[in-house]
Amino acid sequence: ETPVSSRTGNGGTATYSGRTEEGQYGFYIQADQMLFREPSEDASKLSKEGLSIFNLFSFAPDYITDNKYPFYFQTGLVYTGLLPTREKDTTQIALGYGDRNDNADTATKDFSATYVLEAGHSFQINGWWFARPFVQHIRNPKGDCSVKDATVFGLSTGFTF
């Protein structure tokens, strides 16, 4: 038997119920594509600066009540090197959609999908450390229509070892 757990990426949360469910599964697929590449000073090297698009799709059946979002889709744009002299920084904007599991919370009947609009900028402080201030606007947090929309300001950081 496999432990029932859920996880979201990009600084999201992870939960663990301690329950098991026979035969559960899920999958995700992500696609990234550069749309525009800034010209390189050195013709023999391709510039890493430019605009890219990404798409993420995940699915896990809603046959258990712990899986609150059986379907999730996110799309966005990332520009690397948008600011002059900051060629390793990235500027991001993304839109996410999570479809609420109708069986997830029987006490709350007024639920719907959750939508997230996010924007941020990652500052590459040095070769191994970045800081990323961001803002998110969330419509129907937790898929609950009775909860007011939320705007969240945050700061994430990362290290490469």
Report each predicted region and the residues it spans:
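Surface-exposed beta-loop-beta
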Residues: 1-30
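Sequence/structural signature of outer-membrane beta-barrel proteins
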Residues: 1-4, 36-40, 58-64, 98-105, ...
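Transmembrane beta-barrel domains of outer membrane proteins
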Residues: 32-36, 78-82, 120-122, 158-160
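Outer-membrane beta-barrel "beta-signal"
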Residues: 149-161
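Short loop/turn motifs that connect adjacent beta-strands in outer-membrane beta-barrel proteins
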Residues: 36-51, 81-90, 125-128
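Transmembrane beta-barrel strands of outer-membrane/channel proteins
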Residues: 1, 51-59, 73-75, 91-99, ...
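Membrane-embedded beta-strands of outer-membrane beta-barrel proteins
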Residues: 29, 75-77, 93, 117-119, ...
